[in-house]
Amino acid sequence: MTTWDKCLKKIKKNLSTFEYKTWIKPIHVEQNSNLFTVYCNNEYFKKHIKSKYGNLILSTIQECHGNDLIIEYSNKKFSGKKITEVITAGPQANFFSTTSVEIKDESEDTKVVQEPKISKKSNTKDFSSSQELFGFDEAMLITAKEDEEYSFGLPLKEKYVFDSFVVGDANKIARAAAMQVSINPGKLHNPLFIYGGSGLGKTHLMQAIGNHAREVNPNAKIIYTNSEQFIKDYVNSIRLQDQDEFQRVYRSADILLIDDIQFIAGKEGTAQEFFHTFNALYENGKQIILTSDKYPNEIEGLEERLVSRFGYGLTVSVDMPDLETRIAILLKKAHDLGQKLPNETAAFIAENVRTNVRELEGALNRVLTTSKFNHKDPTIEVAQACLRDVIKIQEKKVKIDNIQKVVADFYRIRVKDLTSNQRSRNIARPRQIAMSLARELTSHSLPEIGNAFGGRDHTTVMHAVKAITKLRQSNTSISDDYELLLDKISR
């Protein structure tokens, strides 16, 4: 067994499986007496390995080889010419292979899920208070000069299916619930209320429910819309003196999906109509799925009776995906586009774009378009040039002691409480949150983070990260606190 083989066994115990396979397994180490040269393939990889895992590598080699040694980091690929003993992590991990798979573009055609028609009537009633009552002005209303028929709802996009939704810890509960209601509508989780920030996949999940439910039962009457269109449909039904048709259409749905329901808050007439529509569907065992950017009782201006009804079923969140999931999303997106994307470039983009999935995909498109325009492969260097503004923001230094101070102030405790041995809930939970934030926002290793929190073991940090990730899925208060702290620290 070589020195590096011994080191690998020890290093593996200090890292998650993902970290080990992603960052440690791909490197090559050449040993020449007391000189250890770590080959990292490129500059970005070298900087990351050295900054995040350098101390761990050094201490492990010292433990296995002795203190008299020199470690050098190279941004070049290992040549394969064995001068002395070459120590490797085994076959190079596929994760950082520059080979990519190409497939055909998927169709983005849309299909209309439900299009009931109503005939327009020439007579209209006065509707001067539309802006105040419904949130729309006269410009949003249809007129007699438009087409002779008016359609309710919106079409579902065929590209939004469960297979194209990348699952991770941040969304797996929401995805599982969505799949259940698409197979057995009205039986479980009614209503299903999905909430989370913009660009995190709520609309994708909602439309995937509709598309899959249609496959399961082609005869199901499925209506997909958003709150803006729902308001517009209602206003126009009044304008056309045909509210009965509006009610007949929406209240006869087997599955009703409404995106961004928060926008009906404060719209008295529309909110009342939705309330009665909700009751009619619920009492008849029909499935209701809603999305919002906020938890129901946090939607300002939403009637209490609606908040209460939203709580009848299951409320789940979708949060910003972790690094592993962000990488998977980028690779899947490039795959779907039939584009070549080296895995190391995907990792670079994922590490530097942490806002939402929409911006993550936007960054990917920017890199792919630039590389194609310049007839270059989408390398890390190309990504660095394309995303220099984003990187500049992300490179703002975040220190563990700053995280500790912000968290301590937020929970009204002392910084020394976070590093103490106290295990009471009001201290232990903020400590876990601070550890999780340190893991996400800094380049420090698990042992380094543990040491900053009173000399704790790296396994304690791993446990804290896993615990907080799980709690953010099930505990709204913890999730909201974490997002607020993330925002405060990242400013």
From Swiss-Prot:
GO terms for biological process: DNA replication initiation; regulation of DNA replication. Residues 1-69 are annotated as: Domain I, interacts with DnaA modulators. Residues 372-491 are annotated as: Domain IV, binds dsDNA. Keywords: ATP-binding, Cytoplasm, DNA replication, DNA-binding, Lipid-binding, Nucleotide-binding. One of its GO terms (molecular function) is DNA replication origin binding. It holds the Pfam family Bac_DnaA. Residues 155-371 are annotated as: Domain III, AAA+ region. Its main location: cytoplasm. ATP binds at G199, G201, K202, T203. One of its GO terms (cellular component) is cytoplasm. It comes from the Bacteria. SUPFAM superfamilies: P-loop containing nucleoside triphosphate hydrolases (SSF52540), TrpR-like (SSF48295). Plays an essential role in the initiation and regulation of chromosomal replication. ATP-DnaA binds to the origin of replication (oriC) to initiate formation of the DNA replication initiation complex once per cell cycle. Binds the DnaA box (a 9 base pair repeat at the origin) and separates the double-stranded (ds)DNA. Forms a right-handed helical filament on oriC DNA; dsDNA binds to the exterior of the filament while single-stranded (ss)DNA is stabiized in the filament's interior. HAMAP family: DnaA_bact (MF_00377). Belongs to the DnaA family. Oligomerizes as a right-handed, spiral filament on DNA at oriC. Domain I is involved in oligomerization and binding regulators, domain II is flexibile and of varying length in different bacteria, domain III forms the AAA+ region, while domain IV binds dsDNA. This is Chromosomal replication initiator protein DnaA. It comes from Francisella tularensis subsp. novicida (strain U112).
